[in-house]
Regions:
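Conserved ATP-binding subdomain of kinase catalytic cores across diverse folds
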Residues: 55-195
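General structural signal for secondary-structure boundaries
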Residues: 28-31, 35-40, 95, 163, ...
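Juxta-kinase regulatory segment immediately upstream of eukaryotic protein kinase catalytic domains
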Residues: 32-57, 106, 110
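Compositionally biased, intrinsically disordered low-complexity regions
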Residues: 4-6, 24, 36, 50-52, ...
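Glycine-rich hexapeptide-repeat left-handed beta-helix
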Residues: 1-35
Length: 195
């Protein structure tokens, strides 16, 4: 199969990369600003953002996973971060399928609790996105897992507590989180970092 052609069925091209049926080989994809690796490009396309995405840039200050903000054209003509794309560190999380099963289970449960409480679903619970093929995460050609969630506008992540009020608010939020999960079936959770 030559670059630039359409693959008719699942196959492995000479580079050793598995290609899904109907996907256009990588050389015909639109170049996305900020995307400098094949894995990141594959992930952007796997979640369905490739044709509309304005640009991608590193996001946050995490030390475990590799995180990117995905910017899309806004109605006002300005590019806006709408999604967070994250490569899960498999050196820490050996079973990404179990991590994602936990995340989808807990977030859906929390969203139902927030809905019942009349809360703001867009701000009070993470909203994860499945791949175009309906999977909870995408695995790139190197076996690296990627997940995606909606970006929460005007959210803040503190690396260090700067004032006592911040510590108080985080403790209050964590307590509320635990209360909401009080009846969650803990036996359905996987141990994602074994002892």
């Amino acid at each position: 199969v030559g670059l630039g052609s359409v693959v008719k069925s699942d196959c492995t091209i000479e580079s050793g990369c598995k290609v899904e049926a109907g996907e256009v080989i990588f050389s015909t994809r639109r170049k996305i600003e900020g995307v400098d690796s094949r894995s990141l490009e594959d992930a952007v396309y796997a979640f369905g953002f490739g044709q509309q995405c304005s640009y991608v840039k590193p996001f946050g200050e995490g030390h475990i996973n590799e995180t990117y903000a995905v910017y899309m054209p806004g109605a006002d003509g300005k590019d806006t971060p709408l999604y967070v794309l994250q490569r899960i560190n498999i050196n820490v999380f050996k079973n990404p399928d179990q991590v994602m099963a936990n995340i989808f289970g807990v977030t859906e449960y929390l969203r139902s609790m927030i809905r019942e409480e009349g809360g703001d679903l867009d701000r009070e619970a993470l909203s994860y996105i499945k791949t175009k093929s309906g999977e909870s995460y995408f695995e790139d050609a190197d076996g690296q897992p990627w997940r995606c969630l909606h970006y929460v506008p005007d959210s803040v992540c503190y690396q260090m507590v700067e004032r006592p009020e911040q510590f108080y608010q985080s403790a209050l939020s964590f307590g509320h989180f635990l209360k909401q999960l009080g009846d969650y079936p803990a036996e359905s959770l996987y141990e994602t970092i074994p002892k």
